[in-house]
Amino acid sequence: MSEYLLEMRNIGKEFNGVKALDGIYLKVRAGECVGLCGENGAGKSTLMKVLSGVYPHGTWTGEIFWEGKELKASGIRDTEAAGIVIIHQELMMVPHLSVAENIFLGCEPTTGGFIDYDQMNARAAELLARLKINDINVALPVYHYSGGKQQLIEIAKAINKNAKLLILDEPTSALTASETRVLIDLIKDFKKQGMACVYISHKLDEVAEISDTVTVIRDGAHIATRPMSELTTPDIITMMVGREMKNLFPREPHDIGEVMFEARNISCWDVTNPGRKVVDDVSFALRRGEILGIAGLVGAGRTELVSSLFGVWPGACQGQVFLEGKEIKIRTPRDAVRQGICMVPEDRKRDGILPIMPVGHNMTISVLDRFSLRGLIDKDAELVAIQREILRLKVKTADPMLAIASLSGGNQQKAVLSKMMLPDPKVLILDEPTRGVDVGAKYEIYKLIFALARQGVSILMVSSEMPEVLGISDRVLVIGEGKLRGDFPNENLTQEKVLAAAIGKPATNAA
């Protein structure tokens, strides 16, 4: 019997002659968690698609051995039958089906040729209880539950398929801290029961906590496989990016000028519960060249606030907005962009990109009028602008006419940033600008933010990552339960002080 549950040997994969994977090795023992690390575009997702059967045997080179025998999977059914189950970053839930129906999708229990819903609900409830998940009603539609709960339902679905190896691709990117803790504890329990895990995450603190071994790949090549006990987070970062990064936040001096943007008494109401305020009488000012961070707990009202300022909050709103001292009316994103206010949204996949359109068109769609004459687009002029943006933001793409969905998350995010920078905004709103982005791409995005501030652009940034807020902001607003809880200059500001304000201590205005 082989020492390893899984061995991937010398795996190679090409797309149109371009090598996406070149000689990758990955080994996993039963009961072991292997952290798979690499920048966006390094080849992690491609490697997992090879392993999970998305790319069938024959479309790639190398060998896969499972439980000591060569595995030649022709599709996902083969790998799942063997016990290899992948949970993608984008959850594969059917929102209007019940929890039980999602767990048993494709393998529903039947009696007399008909689905036995009583048996299905009972088995689903039993499965969740076995996983110590006691606050989910299996009869309710999945859309009733948060992203964190849906992630747990996906895991229950995998366990129902008798998974021996669980592949988790960025499982906590949209989870709260408490939901993340539940997930990590669950994975630790699985390890004790002998289940293996491949854990892909840009959150290296999570990788360090649950991984026994770390494999790093860069530009499609295997860089190293080492025990986590021999590594530090800076070691992993150095292997990922190919250089030492002493300071993740490349702060650069920039002048802060007069007030550019002001919001007065902004209130917004819940779409589903119109009597409930999600933003409650918030006022603040933003200066020219200033980076203003917005911190707070998940659900505090941060996204609702900035969405209202960009004209995309679907519920009722009231208040006043001033730009360069003059009151402006923003009812739609078109109004905002015309006034010089642009926004990078929180959910890139849903709100930021047109997935089947080319990378280049996703960049220029905000300024097509620049390349239009009598209703016709000057393709040559547009292509020049696209190529300039690709170079400026270091977007990795073989061809700007490829569908943007084919790019890694970090490169998609750079394209979204480009789309919102091309209109030359006076105010740029960034809602979770580095969510799902690797450490190298984060560094490049931070440099870009500082460069924009030096040019006089006013930056309003929402982030759930406290080190990010404190690392790049000149000033920090704290929102809690829809209210402004604090306004702090970022001088000796600590995470503890921000969190204390977020959970309801009296607001402090020190700006």
From Swiss-Prot:
A GO CC term assigned to this protein in UniProt: plasma membrane
Where ATP binds, per the record, is at 38-45
Subcellular location(s) per record: Cell inner membrane
Membrane-crossing ranges are none
Q: Which domain of life is it from?
A: Bacteria
Question: How does the protein's chain sit in the membrane according to the entry?
Answer: Peripheral membrane protein
- Show the Gene3D superfamilies listed in the entry: P-loop containing nucleotide triphosphate hydrolases
Q: Which Pfam families does its entry note?
A: ABC_tran
* Quaternary structure and interacting proteins, as annotated: The complex is composed of two ATP-binding proteins (XylG), two transmembrane proteins (XylH) and a solute-binding protein (XylF).
Family assignment from sequence similarity: Belongs to the ABC transporter superfamily. Xylose importer (TC 3.A.1.2.4) family.
The function of this protein is: Part of the ABC transporter complex XylFGH involved in xylose import. Responsible for energy coupling to the transport system.
The identity of this protein, by name, is Xylose import ATP-binding protein XylG
